[in-house]
Amino acid sequence: MRIHCLQHLKNDTLGSIGTWIDDKEYKLTKTLLYENSFFPAPEEFDLLLIMGGTMSIYQEEEYSWLKPEKEFVSKVIEAGKPVLGSCFGAQMISEVLGGKVTKNPYKEIGWHTVRSIEENIEQSPSELTDSKLPSCMFPEFTGFMWHGDTFEIPAGAVKLFESEACPNQGFIYNGNVLGLQFHPEANRQWVRNLIRDSGHDLVSGKYIQSEKEILGQESFFDSSRNLTFSLMNWFEEKCGQEN
């Protein structure tokens, strides 16, 4: 299995996703957007990962690589490749598919409950049954958040998840393109790096937890790792179906 990653931050270790890739000994290639905007042809990889970032999707003037990255992601989706977008990555998928990305009413930072949208699942049985997303994602789980923007659910996609602070937490498109507002990659070291680099965001807020609250949740780190491994196994199956 060949995995290509769009990385926006120098210190992004890929967290639990990186651990899963290492354990599987799969080939991993990267486009480091902060250094260059070289993109491979879609046929050169099986799965695309679009990671998070401190920038916003609509800051094309500040980040010259954003427009070509969006064009690349659109090309990959059109080619039918499986795609996983985390936080900023999910927002990118939404915009590429015609959705809008705007400021969320609240900043959401820390561990928060994510709930599945049962009525959407009931109304779209073929889309979701065929996709067979990990059962640990239903009916709810605890996800790690660090965001101030939010995405629309794009046309043709099915809304999957919501949280108290953010109505749109996840969607699936074409059965193999998954956009998640939370960070499935969040393990302890990944979170420590984020706090070190962006700790200034940890101000008083209704949905903003303190460093102590975030790092003191050992069970959440464990359950997040299990969810991420199940999710990556799901993508592994999807890639096998494509090949």
Briefly describe each language-model feature range:
Residues 27-29, 100, 142, 158:
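Conserved beta-strand segments of alpha/beta enzyme cores
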Residues 50-121, 142:
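Cysteine-nucleophile active-site neighborhood
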Residues 20-23, 64-68, 101-102, 161-162, ...:
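Glycine-rich, phosphate-binding/catalytic loops in enzymes
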Residues 1-81, 203-243:
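N-terminal beta1-alpha1 cap of cysteine-dependent amidohydrolase-like domains
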Residues 35-39, 109-111, 151-152, 167-168:
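A short acidic, often aromatic-flanked loop/helix-cap motif at beta-alpha or helix-coil junctions
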